[in-house]
Amino acid sequence: MEEIPVIQIYLWGNLVGAMSWDEERGYADFQFDDKFRRSGLDVSPLMMPLARTRGVVSFPTNARTKCFSGLPGLIADALPDKFGSQLITEWFALQGKTEDMITPLDRLCYVGKRAMGALEFVPAAHVDGVNESTEIYIRELMALSESIFKERSKFQELIRQNDKSILDILKVGTSAGGAKPKAIIAYNEDTDEVRSGQVHAPDGFSYWLLKFDGGTYSEHHEITDNPQGIGNIEYAYYKMATACGITMSECRLLPEGDCHHFMTRRFDRTPTGEKIHMQTAAGIAHLDRDVRHSYEELFGVLRRLGLNYKDFEQLYRRMVFNVIARNHDDHTKNFSFLMDKTGKWSFAPAYDLCYSYNPAGRWTSHHQLSLNSKTDDFTREDLLAVAQNIGIRDANHIIEEVLSSVSSWPETAKECGVKPEHIEAIGKALILTI
């Protein structure tokens, strides 16, 4: 594949702008298309507002960061994280490109029209069959997701052989964020058939993100390391979160052998598969995922976007839930915003709510977002101080609702098929006396 000097970015068929890559400086130059700038669709309202963004713009502070890779946050959100990025790296290796030769623009061209959200990138890399809707098999994808990290030579040989199972995982696994293996699927509830969710599927299919149960990670013992049964745990957390008023997309478990894969309906797609523009908090406000930020900063993003009180209360409920339920994976890419075709922004449903606490963990020993200048050892006074500062009403009532829901952990977990040893370990860590 030849070097890509310039790529174009599209939204709903309209040219948004163009971008080039400066290898020496390590960051991209971006420019809005004049016609799009007059459209009033503020796709990046905080960092590149249309009214104030003219000519070529770049963000040198984003250079060589894992979160942004030298790109504007608007564009960086379309890059896959560890799992999807590793898939793309292996595909490029077979095209003769080593990892240090692959630019972020190359990766965006590989993603093409298959990014999360609604942005599309041209020219798109040609991958045989990747844009076709065909049936896929979860068991095969699970085994392959393991080989990507454990048996690289075997995985590359399958790519060379143009193995159908490799094509399947390239179809479904290269766009989603996060470090752990997942797939973008289309699912037929009547037949249980699973197809690639990266392209338009036939009638009767809906669009989901599937997280592989951790059975392929047999060397991992900590709950935070994605053991078999993690799907059941996340499903129980979904049940507890929605029970205390947190808005989430529909979630399910997909049984497959001894595993239960966690599925969540995509909120960046309409029921008919139309795309919705999406930005994470990291992308929309350039809040680097790998740098400590605060819930107060997130509330500031909601305020700058002009969101309503209901959205502020939603964020407050999520904050309280994350504290009580020990979800320390509360970084800035785990909160998102949606823009409709009129340019109106809203707070996206909650996602990635799961137990994530390890006292010895580098990232999970403390919360990624601070509140009231603390990252752990919170008191009710800390939660109430945040509520007072941002104007949340009935904060004590919200805290009690969350406590009541999370206190049901043993019963909810058992109903959701969580293993007894996981029920016990998580139960001991929950903060139920705040």
Task: Please report, for each region that a protein language model flagged, where it lies by residue.
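Phosphate/dinucleotide-binding and metal-coordinating scaffold of catalytic cores
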Residues: 1-332, 336-434
